[in-house]
Amino acid sequence: MKKFLIFQKKYPKFIYKSYSLNLKPPKLSFEFFYSIPQDFSFVSKFEIQNLPRKSFDREILEDLVFHLGLVEMLNYWKATFSKEIEIEARKLDQREIKFFKTLIFKGMGEYFFQNRIPLSFAKKIKIKYQSGSKKAKKVKLFPKNAILPIGGGKDSIVLAELLKDAKMKLFGFTLNPQKNQLLTLNTLPLTKKIIIKREIDPGLLKLNQAGFLNGHVPFSALLAFLSLILAYIFEAKYIAFGFERSADDPNLKYQGVFINHQWSKSFEFERLFFVFSRKFLLKDIYPFSFLRPLFEIQIGKLFALFPKYHHIFLSCNKPFKINPKVQTWCKTCPKCLFTFVILYPFLGKEVFDIFGENLFEKKELLGLAKSFLDPRVPKPFECLGTKKEIHSAFFLAQKRWNEESSNKKLPYLLNYFKNNFFLGEKQEERMSKKLLFSLGKSNIPSKFLSYLAKKLCLRS
């Protein structure tokens, strides 16, 4: 019997039992209680710091927290892939169920693929709940206020710096920040800096070690629902994400369905979340991704405009997994090579200082380079750009190397690109310009769009 069937048969039900909320400004703490009968129970804990000292409608706050718990539960449910999820914590409108089923099916596609779970089984997951009518609450939200999720990478830096030009009050938050994320948070032009602590139940980690099912969950969806809580608390009309056009690009096809590591960053998710949050939670909220029209290579181009961040940002996730105290680039993972490749055309040899060496010379990265460039090879499960823009980044890197290097011999990976994927100067120039000076579809309010277009033209 397949592994997932063994767990599903032994643990047919997962329960979202309840939640608790403790509001004592300047802190808000809440806990989610989950169980897998008969053997396991879990408590997931959150604490939001730096809250304003004011009163809140507890019913609204509880509803927002409860909905966050629906996303958080996926971290625990994935251990057994129980075929029934029972929601005891609060009533749900039957129209909400469609959203959460979509979140499970598409947001956890990578998990299904990695655990070889047939998608027909994923579609059969049942959500049992108490039905209740629901509509969004109308609350005071100011159009000058915006909530920004802040990571340690280039996207949130570009996001905040561009929105600064729009004279917005920016409320930036970071979840369980590491050293470089705190440094970024404290350097950004933010009106308010918010720290959120999250504590995963240690029992889940024990299940992972014991060989229970594990895999990717839609983390950006968790940030989206956290943002709703903060939007209510800080009276912000806008939630501005740093999700880009490249996030729509899938990694591979599994049983006839495209699997996208970044689905909860995709435009599809953004639109679903926009409609869901305005229909069922906060009537006048406006979540959108300010970087949606841009490819990753365009964001790299904009990031080059902000030198004070060049040596403090960190997009590599590997150090955090191995030793959280080590804050540096591993220089071996897909994120490191990708970031290096898209920044070199705009920063040149400064990238060598950022990474500590020239990654184009590392022969051991050839396999990664192939997965980036070869259309026949699946793209790694990471937050990366499209193969087309990585191709153009390699071309622009080759061009810059030839322009500024006294050593005309191309480094190993650039030479590999030239010998295997180079399409000729004219075609490469045409392709790269098309990528660098285009804007894709978005849900950006029109008053913000001009700031994006203007900044892109500064380095044309």
Question: Could you tell me what each predicted segment is?
Answer:
Residues 1-145, 157, 162-182, 186-203, ...:
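RNA-binding accessory domains that recognize and position tRNA/RNA substrates
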Residues 2-32, 283, 290, 304-460:
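ATP/NTP-dependent adenylation/nucleotidyl-transfer catalytic domains that generate, transfer
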Residues 53, 173-311, 315:
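ATP-dependent adenylate-handling ligase core
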Residues 76-87, 114, 231-239, 344-354, ...:
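Short helix-capping/linker segments at secondary-structure and domain boundaries
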